[in-house]
From Swiss-Prot:
Catalysis performed (reactions): L-glutamate + ATP = L-glutamyl 5-phosphate + ADP
Lineage: Bacteria, Pseudomonadati, Pseudomonadota, Gammaproteobacteria, Lysobacterales
Group of enzyme by EC: transferase
Keyword set includes Cell division: no
E.C. code: 2.7.2.11
InterPro entries xref list: AceGlu_kinase-like_sf, Asp/Glu/Uridylate_kinase, G5K_ProB, Glu/AcGlu_kinase, Glu_5kinase, Glu_5kinase/COase_Synthase, Glutamate_5-kinase_CS, PUA
Pfam assignment, any one: AA_kinase
Name of the molecule in the record: Glutamate 5-kinase
Transmembrane segments: none
Amino acid sequence: MTGIPPPSRFPEQPIPPWRRAVLKVGSSLLAADGGGLSPRFALDLAHFVSANITAGRQLVIVSSGAVAAGRALIPPLPESGGALAARQALAALGQAQLIALWQRFFDRPVAQVLLTHDDLRNRRRYLNARATLRELLHLGTLPVVNENDTVSVDELKLGDNDNLAAIVAALIDAQALFIATDIDGLYTTDPRHHSDAQPLHEVRTLTPENLAMAGDSSSTVGTGGMRTKLEAALKAGAAGIDTYLFNGRSSDVVRGLAQHRLRGTRIHPTCTPIAARKYWLRHAPVEPGAILIDAGAAAALAQQGASLLPGGVLSAEGDFRRGDMIQIATRSPDHPSHPLARGLVQYSAADVRRIAGCHSRDIQTLLGYTYGDTIVHRDDLVLL
């Protein structure tokens, strides 16, 4: 076996501008040799996060390490058939330690967000998760996301935090996914075993060959290897998001990231973020029913790219639910309804009927609750 080639084998390359990103940090960068968590590598990553937040950008951290932290708090558990229950118990014990580790580096609040598979496949939970993360970013906090191992079951697990990071990146409409690992980037073969491994500093299109040559996890504390990172890059790329693989153990490499310089692997997306989202909005199944709007609202949507507010709504047809994909149609006394747009609705049909024609500030009074000022946000809408 040979050592891993030095980071200098990866040429330095510029990172395109971004305004919102996800940083994924694996257990191998946070676990201490004797058990528990270590700030050794987390400190440089925290500096990277702080520098970008100070510059006006937004970041979400997806962090592993709860199980590793929990393992250090109690005597070693015996091997048994209750492996899942044991892991869930360790995650419950270690989650507070993990959040405390990150909080110590920042003078802003750190918010803990635990997600499950169900949260991301259910329309209403998906919308709620997205709204929560966006609001946390708007408030200037630092969200730290982890899979909720305490309640997840095997058949409903997201599987690893690499894939969770890609899903979160799409959830918040990020432009970049940074994956900190313990290897310098992607190689033509596993550099731990092959001295002739060549660095791949840029990948335009991920191929089955790339996935095949990616090694499995060699860490004793994590669940994801290079293959899961490439699978995550595929997910992110389908949403128009760049993925950057880099060595989180190298201070020079991490400091370079703060100056928008990468020594690692950049994996390009398969389309632009706007194209990916607009394609999905245009082709996703539409629920029966529609929202009928007046001419003023139609002009605001078509000419100004505005969100749909309750003031321009005439009525709602059908029995759609919050989070459904619905049609938006114009209606006037002289013309029948004509489809104008489609989008993800923030309120149910019953709620829309109650707030139709009112000002956004009156939603709370009329309903007793609010999901925001818009019925369909412009980011969730596409013109037909």
